[in-house]
Structure formats: C-alpha cells, structure tokens
C-alpha cells in the first residue's frame, strides 16, 4: 500500500493592502492549499493570483470559507443560523469553483476557517450543515478537518 502525506496550508488571506503570509515562499513545499474566499481575507485579485500560484506548483486547490468577518479575520464567533451558514458556504465555495474552473482546473477540497471551524467542532448540527452543504454543492469535494 502506497502511503501519502498531504502538506496543507491556508493561503490567499491578504486583503488589498493588508498583507498576510508568504504564499510565494511556502507554495513550492506544500501539496494542497486552502484559499480564502473573501469573507475573512482574500480579495478577488489575491484569490486569482493564489489559485494561479497553486496550479503552477501542482498544488491542489481548496476553498477556505468563513463567517463574514473581515474585521476579526473570521475568528469571532458570530450568531448565525444554519440557513445563514449554508448560504455563506454556497456563495464562497461556488465562487472558488467558478474561478478555479475559469483557470482550467477543479476545486479539490474545502476547509472551513476560524470561528466556523471551531463552532463545527463543538456543535454537531453546525457540522452536519457544513457537511451536507459541501456534499450538495459537489459530492466529490473532500472536506479537510483537524487531524
């Protein structure tokens, strides 16, 4: 049996003048990345640039959706309904699917970000909403979680 380790990293979290991370330096050393979808980081230019960078390094592209929290970088727990979570995920993941497709590739996975990630680890119903929404968008998308 062949063994494989996926080295994964959050990327594309800069937002216009607010620079976050060293994506260009890290990308050659990873096998998959989670690209911010615009709600905690990741403006349109950064998203496109980061997807292109991943593709040129043969790195699998994933969506990194969050609660709508630019000010708190997606780390603040916000009161949201399950329907709101579903809508946020549909919007952000679909955006990454569209851009990735436009650039000639396919979205590989989803890893939710920050507070949403933490909320899902503590609330089974939120976790179920996330899993069902991702499956409804594309049953072939992988869901990345804590190891």
Feature annotation, model-predicted:
Residues 35-40, 119-120, 137-147:
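Catalytic beta/alpha-barrel core
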Residues 15-47:
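A short alpha/beta connector and helix-capping loop motif
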Residues 5-19:
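N-terminal basic/disordered segments at the start of proteins
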Residues 11, 53-78:
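Glycine-rich nucleotide/cofactor/substrate-binding loop typically near the N-terminus or early
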Residues 70-104, 109:
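Glycine/small-residue-rich loop that forms an oxyanion/phosphate-binding "nest" at active or ligand-binding sites
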Residues 123-129:
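Charged helix-capping and loop-helix junction motifs
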Residues 24-28, 49-62, 101-104:
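Acidic (Asp/Glu)-rich catalytic clusters
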């Amino acid at each position: 049996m062949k063994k494989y380790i996926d080295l994964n990293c959050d990327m594309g979290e800069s937002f216009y003048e607010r620079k976050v991370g060293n994506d260009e330096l890290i990308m050659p050393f990873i096998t998959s990345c989670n690209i911010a979808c615009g709600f905690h980081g990741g403006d349109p230019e950064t998203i496109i640039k980061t997807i292109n960078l991943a593709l040129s390094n043969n790195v699998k592209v994933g969506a990194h959706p969050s609660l709508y929290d630019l000010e708190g970088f997606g780390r603040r727990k916000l009161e949201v309904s399950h329907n709101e979570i579903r809508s946020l995920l549909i919007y952000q993941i679909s955006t990454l699917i569209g851009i990735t497709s436009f650039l000639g590739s396919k979205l590989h996975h989803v890893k939710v970000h920050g507070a949403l990630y933490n909320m899902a680890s503590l609330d089974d119903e939120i976790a179920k909403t996330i899993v069902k929404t991702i499956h409804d968008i594309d049953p072939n998308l992988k869901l990345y979680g804590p190891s």
